[in-house]
């Protein structure tokens, strides 16, 4: 993704529904909602429900987790709409890592997001962006944390940073 990729307008909800109806093969389609930060959309639970109604077998969310931590009602709405799984940005077990990569302390936020997802039976996969000399030394701690949070945390997907495109 490109953090400075420029602003654009989100698709209208009705347009999203049209795309889902056109593209989904009932019972065989998995949709992952991502791009920018999907949880800035108040209608995301309705989009999840529309994907399920169109026949999506699995609906996944790729998120930074901030709104999931701050708004448990939103998490409940996503779960009730049929969200299957959450892939959450999770860069390490030390706020210094978050300050270096994200500009602020976020470890407590990430933990709260996991707790809120667990309360609503949403599985979470942690997604660390690995940056040499920033958080690669924390890989073992991330794995140990993931194991300690089972069954809520169900996996870790490491993404090595790649410097290309717009910076």
Tell where the protein language model's regions lie, with residue ranges.
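Canonical Radical SAM [4Fe-4S] cluster-binding loop centered on the CxxxCxxC motif
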Residues: 1-14
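A C-terminal junction/extension of Radical SAM enzymes
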Residues: 162-167
